[in-house]
């Protein structure tokens, strides 16, 4: 039983091998190889322009929205190379949700924001939608704050509430993976704390990949940390080791604040 538990714990959702990405003639990611573990929080850190956000957007192929992008290598999700698979993009993005730096709720009601995804994927019965909306808002620590005003415009919420609504919207499609691109950088400290608590509560149910500039945040909430520099992966490992005993001097210099 113990061996089975260890095997389950270390299952990889993503296996990236020699992955390269170009914007036109400019190479933005160079020979990236890493594994992202199931039901772990992985923080992606590094200075501005190092490729963090570019990398995370490849994980659900949002990068394909840019016609100038070219990719090579292996980007394996559930054992399928996303660069060669015929997997439907809508199904991929249902399985791999995305939360952006700036809260981006739809200009619709709170209810409709959360129900939108399930409707797109064929759920029509009001009772079922009601249950999904409630469970998703509870999962995002927002239900108690909005349960009596679900028909209010989502844009009437505070910035922190809007970001948690966007997380609820991502949860509503029952994803396997949540990608978060600096989800707290536009929030005040109190809202940031709530989102960090939310991420901690979700880690047992979802694989989470978060881009952050905040070293303290990465140390607080992640199980593993990957350090990117100038389009390359310098190292990845358990967060405690990355911050206390990194293998590379460049990592040590970055996490100790000597450059950023």
UniProtKB/Swiss-Prot annotation:
It is a peripheral membrane protein. Belongs to the ABC transporter superfamily. Phosphate importer (TC 3.A.1.7) family. This is Phosphate import ATP-binding protein PstB 1. It comes from the Bacteria. Its EC number is 7.3.2.1. The gene is pstB1. InterPro entries: AAA+_ATPase, ABC_transporter-like_ATP-bd, ABC_transporter-like_CS, P-loop_NTPase, PstB-like. SMART domains: AAA (SM00382). GO terms for cellular component: plasma membrane. ATP binds at residues 46-53. The keyword Calcium does not apply. It is an enzyme of class 7 (translocase). The complex is composed of two ATP-binding proteins (PstB), two transmembrane proteins (PstC and PstA) and a solute-binding protein (PstS). Part of the ABC transporter complex PstSACB involved in phosphate import. Responsible for energy coupling to the transport system. Pfam families: ABC_tran. One of its GO terms (molecular function) is ATP hydrolysis activity. PANTHER family: ABC TRANSPORTER I FAMILY MEMBER 17. Disulfide bonds: none annotated. It comes from Shouchella clausii (strain KSM-K16). The lineage of its organism: Bacteria, Bacillati, Bacillota, Bacilli, Bacillales. GO terms for biological process: phosphate ion transmembrane transport. It is found in: Cell membrane. Residues 8-255 form the ABC transporter domain. It catalyses: phosphate(out) + ATP + H2O = ADP + 2 phosphate(in) + H(+). Keywords: ATP-binding, Cell membrane, Membrane, Nucleotide-binding, Phosphate transport, Translocase, Transport.
């Amino acid at each position: 039983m113990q061996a089975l538990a260890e095997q389950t714990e270390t299952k990889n959702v993503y296996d990236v091998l020699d992955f390269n990405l170009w914007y036109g003639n400019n190479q933005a990611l160079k020979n990236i190889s890493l594994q992202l573990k199931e039901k772990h929080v992985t923080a992606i850190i590094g200075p501005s322009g190092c490729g963090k956000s570019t990398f995370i957007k490849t994980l659900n192929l949002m990068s394909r929205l840019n016609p100038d992008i070219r990719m090579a290598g292996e980007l394996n999700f559930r054992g399928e190379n996303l660069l060669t698979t015929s997997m439907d993009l809508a199904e991929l993005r249902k399985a791999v949700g995305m939360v952006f730096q700036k809260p981006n709720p739809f200009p619709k009601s709170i209810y409709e924001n959360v129900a939108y995804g399930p409707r797109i994927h064929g759920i029509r019965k009001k009772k079922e939608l009601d249950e999904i909306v409630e469970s998703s808002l509870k999962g995002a620590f927002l239900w108690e704050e909005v349960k009596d005003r679900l028909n209010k415009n989502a844009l009437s919420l505070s910035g922190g509430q809007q970001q948690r609504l966007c997380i609820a919207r991502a949860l509503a499609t029952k994803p396997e993976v949540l990608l978060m691109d600096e989800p707290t950088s536009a929030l005040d400290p109190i809202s940031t704390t709530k989102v960090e608590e939310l991420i901690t509560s979700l880690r047992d149910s979802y694989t989470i990949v978060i881009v952050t500039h905040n070293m303290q945040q990465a140390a607080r909430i992640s199980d593993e940390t990957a350090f990117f520099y100038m389009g390359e992966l310098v190292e990845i490992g358990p967060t405690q080791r990355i911050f206390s005993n990194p293998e590379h001097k460049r990592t040590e210099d970055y996490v100790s604040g000597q450059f950023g």
